[in-house]
């Protein structure tokens, strides 16, 4: 939506302004298995089953899926990456 677009623009602006000494990137996660999902108080089993079908990898993400992306962006392996959004969504945005 528009709030994600605004955050993306702000991230890119910061990446340009703070370069070359500071790298700025963002992460756009898909649905993450949290207590909200696990307790199923917010969604019915049918709603969850229908939503999971929208994920090519067949499941919601786990917190370690996101933390792995954070670790990558903080590591030297990403030293030439700035102004980028790392999409970690199990392929959801492909559909």
Regions found by a protein language model. Name each.
Residues 3, 11:
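Active-site helix of classical SDR
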Residues 16-20, 32, 61, 74:
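A short hydrophobic alpha-helix cap/turn motif
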Residues 19-23, 81-83:
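Short, small/polar-rich loop/turn modules that mediate ligand/substrate recognition or access, typified
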Residues 28-39:
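Short, flexible catalytic-loop segment of classical short-chain dehydrogenase/reductase
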Residues 41-55:
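A short C-terminal helix-loop "cap" of Rossmann-like NAD(P)-dependent dehydrogenase/epimerase domains
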Residues 55-66:
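A conserved structural motif in NAD(P)-dependent oxidoreductases
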Residues 66-67, 73:
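Non-catalytic, hydrophobic alpha-helical segments
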Residues 71, 82-95:
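Short C-terminal tail/terminal secondary-structure segment
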């Amino acid at each position: 939506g528009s709030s994600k677009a605004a955050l993306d623009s702000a991230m890119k602006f910061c990446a340009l302004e703070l370069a070359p000494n500071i790298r700025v990137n963002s992460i756009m996660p898909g649905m993450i298995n949290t207590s909200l999902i696990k307790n199923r108080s917010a969604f019915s089993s049918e709603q969850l089953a229908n939503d999971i079908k929208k994920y090519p990898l067949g499941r919601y993400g786990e917190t370690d899926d996101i933390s792995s992306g954070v670790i990558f962006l903080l590591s030297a392996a990403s030293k030439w990456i700035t102004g980028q959004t790392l999409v970690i969504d199990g392929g959801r945005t492909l559909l």
